[in-house]
Amino acid sequence: MKIHPHIHRLLLACLALLLGGPALFAQERKVQNKPFIDERRFHYGFFIGAHDQGLQLYNNGYIDPNTGDQWVAQADQQGLGFSVGVLGEWRLSKTLGLRVLPTLHFGTKHIVFRNLATSRRDAQTMKSTYIAVPVDLKVAAPRFNNFRPYVIGGIQPSIDLTSGKHTKVRTKPFNLMLEMGMGCDLYMPFFKFIPELKFCLGLGNILDKKRTDLTDPSQLIYTESLDRATMSMFVLTFYFE
């Protein structure tokens, strides 16, 4: 099984952070802020963040039998998106926690279409609003002073509220993603601040091939030229607990 290069690098970084993080900060003991906050059975908070939505398109070389046109598509750019949500964590043990994170993702993707026969170009901007409910397992290293690194892994089911408004190419509303990442609990005097970076990889084909909504048959060529589409995300999140 071939491992995605981004996943490989993130796994190595997570392992290094989890195993070596405390040693980097082990010069001296300091007074601990919020020393008993991790003893609570349930933890709650909120978060804001930024993300980068990636759309991978797989062209199939389809040629229109009527015109001889052959189109290829590429997601050439994606704007920086915004994320906001709430955090609920159930403490399973001293090092394990189960997290549920109802989230709203707002983002934009841009697709360029190119006709290989005529060199004609076309484009589509896809604005998306996702309601997601990630469920993650959190594995934390022992706390040292006011620093505690951790890694997470889980799944993220989501629904795109705006998929019905997409024109040339449309994606399915439901998507399921695998996510993994790393972060660090930083214990402040009155709250816990948690920066986290994670990578999300789509597990299914989100290309909608059933375009009964199209009234112009010539617009179907963009969908016919693609076999499948998958989505990925890099998410930088700041939690406040």
Segment roles from a protein language model:
Residues 39, 93, 142-146, 187-191, ...:
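Outer-membrane beta-barrel channels and translocator barrels
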Residues 40-42, 78-82, 127-133, 147, ...:
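Residues that define the transmembrane beta-barrel architecture of outer-membrane proteins
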Residues 31, 173, 186-241:
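Predominantly the C-terminal beta-signal and adjacent terminal strand-loop region
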Residues 51-55, 105-109, 156-162, 200-206:
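Structural signature of outer-membrane beta-barrel domains
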